[in-house]
Amino acid sequence: APGEWYFNASEKTLYFFPPLGLNLATAKIEISALKHLIECKGQEDEPLKNVSFKGIHFVNAERTFMEKYEPLLRSDWCIYRGAAVVLENTENCTLADCTFSNLGGNAVFISRYNLSTTIRGCHFYDIGASAIALVGDTSAVRSVPNRYEKVTLPDQMDYVPGPNNHLYPRQCLIEDNLIHHIGRVEKQVAGVQIQVAAQITVRHNSIYQVPRAAINVGDGAFGGHLIEYNDAFETVLETSDHGAFNSWGRDRY
């Protein structure tokens, strides 16, 4: 079909079926060379603060399918901890009025400790995996229930209340974004994925044409999220046993 391609490694030849109207004699050919375009990383005891990106177009990052994935908590999710833009150990960082397109993996990954991250007014489309992932470290959860079949007996359970450490996003705002045509390569994805996080606000976003959930809350750690006034439609197009808004069970019970 038009737009499809095949690389014959033994012949070192790329075969491409051009779309109608494309002149190969004058076409521009671009090849991805990076999985992560920008990484903003501080230290847990010395976070990176007050960095803002505004009006930037992030495009053409490599695919990350079949890279090293890590299992998360109670759900069956595994995830690649990376994206075109990665924020880790940050405070008060902002992505505003940016465009993310033609990316092979996740677009934005808010990883481990992040306080007061804002993603506002951005456009995400033709994304290989998830648009926005807010994912803490499972070490922040006591008595980690990371598989269905793994059972923690009462005498082995950590009964201390609260997180085990600070390696998780909290008090972040995802607002007024347009997200569509994601999961072009991977299918266990979401427009907004929340896992091992606290007090995440997701509001006034439009999310459609996704293979799985528009918004997915992967576990019950640590709650306090506010999800309101989002427009989600044309979801769960390529998978099943899911929903436009999907959430999994509590982890501390």
Identify what each model region corresponds to.
Residues 36-45, 65-66, 83-89, 106-113, ...:
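Glycine-rich beta-solenoid repeat tracts in large extracellular/virion proteins
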Residues 2, 11, 189, 212, ...:
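Active-site lining segments that contact anionic ligands and/or coordinate catalytic metals
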Residues 49-60, 91-105, 114-129, 138-160, ...:
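Right-handed parallel beta-helix
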Residues 1-101, 140-164:
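Extracellular polysaccharide-degrading/modifying enzymes targeting complex plant/algal/animal polysaccharides
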